[in-house]
Amino acid sequence: MLLDNVVKQMSQEEIVNLANELTDAVEKNKFNMLCETGKLKYAHLIAMFLATQAMDDGRKLYLYFYKLAMKCGKDRIISKVNNGNKIKIAFLPISASEWQAEYIYRKLENDNRFEVEIVPVPLIGRSKEDRTAIYLQTCRFFGSDKYNVKEIYDTETEEIKGWDEIGGIPDIIVHLTPWYLNIAPSYQITKLPLNVVNIYISYSLSIGNSKTEEWESYRYNQDFLNVMWKVYTETHKDF
């Protein structure tokens, strides 16, 4: 398929519809079935996060759905482990300059319980020239040092492979940027089923706040971070 270069946010109508679908799944006792079969997506959970922001006790309501979603992903992994199957993990870098996961990648690579791959993802909302330069540089970086790399984007034709063309959606995805709307749509977190566990490794660590104390909330209380199972940062110092 051709890469869609348009950055798209959820409309208010989409947010309401997706949040209602998630609510209906729980009320009709279909959540587990729809989650296990991949019918419920992270778009549903993000919509619920956005829909509950202005509600009284909205945080409490959102956390109820969040915990259900996290359990779905963890249960899938536990089942695979109990059946003796390997856990498939994919890292999604967007740039060679933002590779903050070397340590954990090598640890997982050397553990035979895991199957690890790196999937460089092209950026959207920019010129073909800029996207091509960044993507090729990223692929060269990972291709030169014995990483298991899956290239998904043809810079000449603008064709992009989906998850099904590179071995399927993994069990765990390690995200390396929180700006998910700026990567290829088919690899955005909104497209992932709720039975996938998502981790984010930050490329920086902020230990301060603004005088109004709003910066911390602005930076960390985002939809993306609120649907992660865990958020980590690489540091050589124990804070």
Features from the language model and the residues they span:
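Non-catalytic N-terminal targeting/anchoring module and adjacent flexible stem/linker
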Residues: 1-93, 110, 123
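Active-site and donor-binding regions of nucleotide-sugar-utilizing enzymes
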Residues: 9, 13, 17, 32-36, ...
